Amino acid sequence: MTSLEDNSQLQPEHSTTSFQPPCCRHTHTSDTHEPWRSLLHNAAPKEHIVQLYQDEQFLNRAVCRFAAAALAHGEGVILVPTAAHWEAFCPRLEAEGVDLSAALSQGQLTVVDADELLPRFMGEKMPDAPVFLGLAGEVVARARSRDRYPKVRWWGEMVNVLWERGNATASMALEDLFDQLAHEQEIAIFCSFLMDNFNGEVHTRMLPRLGQNHSHLIPVEDYFRLESAVADALREVVGPVEASVLEKKLLEQYAPPFAMPSSQALLFALRQVVPGVADAVLQRSGTLYRAS
């Protein structure tokens, strides 16, 4: 991993081929079940996307999809991982056709250690907004390489580091700053949280807050399995007739706080409108999703 002053340390020693725009060759899984792949592939400036994950392979696939697509599009890419995750990303990126040494040396890819950058703008418990925006602006300016790569994407997990430390307040304050950064710098931002989408506390406290500073939610890896699990769980909990009426009514009348799969929006709506059955449907949905 590297400091802000030196990106060269990240170049893999074993990669010697000349740089070619990376492509996502390994696309055996249909985007029908995983629309998040298209969302990340085509991430646009000012979009702020959040992923919930428990499986490290899901994290790796999503981040490398986001980064490899940007490199293929001729965009600058900023990654701010922990050292352990950067080590896991490298072989995946190379398998997708990315020449890491060339991407780093040419300035198209900028990688900064999350554990190195985070203390530089954190106060006692909360992020210092002016310091963060100044440091982040420096990273974005580097990624643009004097307008060689005017379009830039950023993925990072400093917000998750704070979340895993138990400092949810600071994590959400930092997300607010990232949302500000996305709009001021006109970049796409993607972040990932180690959260269980079928946890009641996450649905009650964290997802509504994430809806205040994100444009899109990626709640699970397989949207088709989620849709099936939620539909079956709702039928089991309230009965098939009531489930049909309730689903139609909620999806028509309730607008989720940010873009998400319709089945996820249904879980949101249940908690807002019929809280008495929300936890039962959520827990059963999780059981069915994991078993499918």
Task: Give names to the regions the model predicted.
Residues 2-292:
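Non-catalytic regulatory/interaction regions at protein termini and inter-domain linkers
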